[in-house]
Design a protein with these regions (language model features):
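Extended, low-polarity transmembrane helix blocks
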Residues: 1-36, 80-130
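Acidic/proline-rich low-complexity IDRs
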Residues: 8, 74-75
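N-terminal first-folded block
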Residues: 14-65
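Hydrophobic, membrane-inserted alpha-helices
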Residues: 68-74, 92-97
Length: 130
């Protein structure tokens, strides 16, 4: 009897082809975004340097954030590490949202959109891996 329940549960957790395609599209879009954003932080693009000056933690924080974003982007593209990458970037986006609201001002909408995208990927990939 427990074998039938296990089989039924694994069938429910198995993603449909359409869901898998949507998740991969979200992962690729997010990875491209974070490669660009993280790369610009690591390269020291002037607006990034200025933004991190305004944050006030020092430029080491720009390198850390850029490194986390590029690492997360890479992890999003490797099937066995997608969940880790998406979770890492979700936490990073929480920090970005709070920073925009408390320190930087301006619109946190891009960070919120990325948070929702990555939260969706994290949720479904976690459900699939159970």
């Amino acid at each position: 009897m427990s074998t039938n329940v296990s089989a039924a549960l694994s069938e429910v957790a198995r993603p449909t082809k359409g869901l898998n395609i949507v998740l991969w599209i979200l992962q690729i879009l997010a990875a491209a975004t974070f490669f660009l954003a993280g790369g610009s932080k690591l390269a020291g693009v002037a607006p990034m340097v200025e933004m991190f000056d305004k944050i006030g933690l020092g430029q080491w924080f720009r390198y850390l954030t850029g490194g986390l974003e590029v690492t997360g982007a890479i992890l999003l593209l490797i099937p066995g590490t997608v969940l880790l990458g998406s979770a890492l970037l979700v936490v990073t986006m929480v920090g970005a949202i709070v920073t925009h609201l408390v320190i930087l001002g301006g619109s946190p909408v891009p960070a919120i959109v990325l948070f929702v995208m990555l939260g969706t990927v994290t949720w479904y990939r976690w459900r699939i891996n159970q």
